[in-house]
Amino acid sequence: MTRGKPGRAGHDRRHASTGEHGLVIAAHGRHYLVERKGGGLLQCFPRGKRSECAVGDRVIFEATAVDQGVVVRVEERRNLLHRSDQFKSKQLAANIDQVLIMLGTEPGFSEDLLGRALVAAESLGITPLILLNKIDLTARLETARARLALYRALGYAVVELSVHAAPEAAHAVLAAHVAGRSSILIGQSGMGKSSLLNLLIPGVDAQTREISEKLDSGKHTTTFTRLYHLPSGWGHGGTLIDSPGFQEFGLHHLTEGMLERAFPEFRPRLTECRFYNCRHLQEPGCGILGAMAEGKIDPRRHALYAQLLHESEQQKPW
């Protein structure tokens, strides 16, 4: 019998047995910054053409120089948060416990983006936490609260704070939510994410510069996702992942079945549909449409579901 060449899985296992364990703490294109288990940072590249790592991944890597290496294998993930559109898919973070969705009273926040972020978290079984910042700017505070009433009624926690005007109070309330957890901070630009990072992570600007230099991303310090360890003095560990601000949150990768279960108010009604393959759009005997007619499901939420379902049906090259 002729022995064939070892497959990729065997190849990776063989290399993994001699590699080191590390944590991906930053990603920019195909460049990754990996933190060694015993300390120290290396710039690493994936083996092969595809970029398969995400910030928060635990990996096996081989050092190829004092400060460089190659990722041999990504260890099994608990979850992977990513966004996608019709043309590409972008990994945001892996192995996270919580999604912090940063909003502000001013400028006005996108309710569409909020809804999509909640759906993304729900689809993975990850806890979302809505942060309403800039509550000291009272001109639009009540409007913001009114817009968030729907989400409070659905059971989503909303934390109100003012990072700029009341930093000590903001620090206290946020520390209680992030200590001991791996959280990712997402949101539109202008909501106060940078101020929040400076509040929670001492020396964050210096860390960001170091990461940027090691990734060779130069001045593009806001275009990569990065992980920060929470202060050891908190006594509970934990990490905070910061992602670049964005204006869209595509979820083209979610299937019809994943979408309908990512709306918590839909779940109790799914068994009431007359047809097993009901799409909850215009089918007779639909439990979701019936609940909406009774005022138990908000039309805005159903409109978001319908839009996401339409997007999921678009042909994708990835």
From Swiss-Prot:
Residues 84-249 form the CP-type G domain. Residues 1-21 are annotated as: Disordered. The keyword GTP-binding applies. Monomer. Associates with 30S ribosomal subunit, binds 16S rRNA. Residues 1-16 have a biased composition (Basic residues). This is Small ribosomal subunit biogenesis GTPase RsgA. It comes from Ralstonia nicotianae (strain ATCC BAA-1114 / GMI1000) (Ralstonia solanacearum). HAMAP family: GTPase_RsgA. It comes from the Bacteria.
